[in-house]
Amino acid sequence: MVTSVLSSVTISRVSSVLNRDVKQFGKQFLFDGREETCWNSDQGSCQWVLMEFPQNVLVSQIHLQFQGGFSCQTCALEGCYKDGELVKIADFYPEDTNTLQKFTFAEQSVSKLRVSFLNSTDFFGRITLYHLDVLG
């Protein structure tokens, strides 16, 4: 059975926050489990979320919930060990919907994981993400 590898000591970073308003749209809302909060990127191509784990973790699934109209057609998942360079694990292709989407890939051991949103469905390149979880 797979379980979340995210914890209170997981460090996260994002490419941008809409209007730099971290109180309303910051990265902390990706992981809070509340339906009414979200991370909202600013405009621009190739938005991303990076997670750093305190030790190596095994990952095999990612769960995402976008706001329809502000999702992504192609995502790249990359990972590495502590000081290594990120290498591609998988590409996946979310639908432009509000529902929770689950993607499975070959199990990998990583200490850093980056999800890159390569082409947003929004004309300005914004991403709105209500939920992100990584399981292994």
From Swiss-Prot:
Compartments, record wording: Nucleus
Primary residence: nucleus
Any one GO CC term of the record: nucleus
Keywords annotated in UniProt: Nucleus
Taxonomic superkingdom: Eukaryota
Family: Belongs to the NR2C2AP family.
Function per UniProt: May act as a repressor of nr2c2-mediated transactivation by suppressing the binding between nr2c2 and its response element in target genes.
Protein's UniProt name: Nuclear receptor 2C2-associated protein
Organism annotation: Xenopus tropicalis
